[in-house]
Amino acid sequence: VLAAVVILSTHTALRAETPQEWAALGARVHGGYGAFIPLGIKIGLDASEKLKAGPRGLTLLYFDNPKAPCACFADGIAIATGASVGQRSLVVAKDHAPDNAAAVIVIRPRKGGEGLKYTIPMAALPRLGAINKELADPVARHEAVMKADGLFLVETAQ
């Protein structure tokens, strides 16, 4: 799956425009389209907009929590930003996210400068699980996540 992200994110970053295109791209890259993927896309698009970055213009440092069910958020962020392991712009940290966070992602401009720290709280997981359980359609999942507030926190990265 990670190899697919490396290959596809280089060529298709930010080319998806509709919920249908995002869901199709996410499913093709990740192998499915649960609610974690569109949350990653939402974070990636938010960071790209706030940091005024184009495709492949950001670096990501991803802190996973082994208590979270998966690190699928990383695939969504990679899809939205064009970051990849192969380009050395996506790194999964050896250290873990704190216990109260499913993931922490530090996103910075590739050329340097101030970045952003995104935290996905463990408290968001039941909401994401409910979206997956209640909505079988990937496009409906995408739209539900994009409309939802409070699924992540964002602050300036130190």
Residue ranges and their predicted role:
Residues 1-10:
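Bacterial N-terminal signal peptides
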Residues 16-33, 42-158:
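Non-transmembrane, aqueous-exposed alpha-helical and coiled segments at domain scale
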